[in-house]
Each structure stands twice: as structure tokens, then as C-alpha cells.
A protein has these predicted regions:
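Hydrophobic or amphipathic alpha-helical targeting/insertion segments
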Residues: 4, 8-19, 129-151, 155-157
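Short, hydrophobic/aromatic-rich segments at coil-to-beta transitions
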Residues: 109-115
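Short, solvent-exposed loop/turn segments at the edges of secondary structure
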Residues: 110, 136, 159-163
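Aromatic pocket-lining residues of Rossmann-like dinucleotide-binding sites
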Residues: 1
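Core beta-strand elements of the Rossmann-like FAD/NAD(P) dinucleotide-binding domain
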Residues: 121-131
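Conserved N-terminal/central alpha/beta ligand/cofactor-binding core
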Residues: 6-7, 12-104, 160
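Solvent-exposed loop/turn segments at secondary-structure junctions
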Residues: 15-17, 103-104, 122, 139-140, ...
């Protein structure tokens, strides 16, 4: 919305951007491809291009087995992800309110007109808006406005499997690759 000229405020609970992608050890950026066709472009691709330019991502790498979810993944450096995200939002004119969470919402018959944030220090700020996008990750704003929700999938209430990514230094990569080749039954490819 900021890129299109609308006054835009991003409310972020952490002191940095990226959500689970930078606050945890979440796996790679999800696929931009369906089979061999790239189906996600626009701002996400601009972000990926900037990450590659900053030496913060591998870019799109073809997967050995997409498990039905897409044929590419993009690994990334969490700190460069934070930097590129902030730089792009600044360019788009987006204001960012860090260390703040949603305290309450102004909602009448599912019409959302505003919300109040609370900062880490306890300060409360109220915002009115024509459009509010719930990007909390858990639908916090929608739930506070009375929307129905379910935990996990609606039938078995199962969650997505967790993913983890980590970095290591001083690894004997030749030895690791040799082990993988000699012990393929220990890995899913």
C-alpha cells in the first residue's frame, strides 16, 4: 500500500522486521514456482532480487523433491533479510512502529475502523484507518473482531511440521558431503 502512495503504518511486535522468518530459525523462503513456472512475482520477487544483490540469499534454487509445494526454495541470511525489508519499506514511505502489539480493536458488526497498540514500555496509541490488514501471523486482529477460527487444520487440528535452519562455521564440507553420499538412508531427498 505504501508503494502505491497510501499512508501506511506497519505495527511490529519485535525490534526488527521479518516475523518468524527472522525471529526464529524458520526454513527457507517458500517456493515462487509451480513446477517450472514462476507464479509469484512483484514485491516478493523484488525482495528476493535485493536479497541476492546484498549477498543475503541464494535466490531460487531448484529442489530435489518439492513434496508438491513448488520446485524452488531460497535460503537467506536473517540479518540481511531484516536490513533489506527495512530499506524497501522506507523507499515505499511506510512508517514502522516497533515493540508494539495490538491491545484492542474498534469493531462494530465485523466493520473494523481502528485499533489500539501497547508498546513494550506500556504506552498505548490509538489509530483509525480505512483499511486494516491483519498480518499478525495468528489472525489476532480478526479474532478480536469476532471472526471464527480453528487451530490447525479444521478436521484433525494438526499443525504444519516445524522447520529449522541454522548456520555453522569451520565445517569440513568434504567430510560432510562424503558422509551424505555414503549414508543416503539417513536423509530425505
Amino acid at each position: 500500500s505504501g508503494k502505491l502512495g497510501a499512508d501506511t503504518l506497519l505495527i511490529e511486535k519485535n525490534g526488527f522486521l521479518g516475523g518468524a522468518a527472522t525471529a526464529s530459525v524458520l526454513g527457507p523462503i517458500s517456493p515462487f514456482h509451480y513446477k517450472d513456472e514462476q507464479v509469484i512475482n512483484g514485491i516478493p520477487q523484488d525482495f528476493m532480487d535485493r536479497m541476492v544483490k546484498e549477498a543475503g540469499s541464494t535466490g531460487h534454487m531448484k529442489t530435489l523433491d518439492p513434496y508438491g509445494s513448488g520446485d524452488s526454495l531460497g535460503f537467506y541470511d536473517r540479518e540481511k533479510y531484516k536490513y533489506v525489508a527495512v530499506e524497501m519499506l522506507k523507499e515505499f514511505g511506510v512508517d514502522i512502529l516497533y515493540h508494539s502489539m495490538i491491545d484492542s480493536v474498534d469493531c462494530d458488526n465485523f466493520k473494523l475502523t481502528g485499533l489500539t497498540t501497547v508498546s513494550k514500555g506500556g504506552d498505548r496509541l490509538h489509530f483509525s484507518a480505512h483499511v486494516i490488514v491483519d498480518a499478525t501471523g495468528d489472525g489476532d486482529i480478526a479474532v478480536r473482531c469476532g471472526e471464527n477460527y480453528c487451530i490447525g487444520d479444521p478436521v484433525e487440528h494438526k499443525f504444519s511440521p516445524s522447520s529449522a535452519m541454522f548456520e555453522m562455521a569451520n565445517v569440513d564440507t568434504e567430510k560432510v558431503f562424503r558422509y551424505i553420499q555414503e549414508n543416503q538412508e539417513d536423509f530425505e531427498f
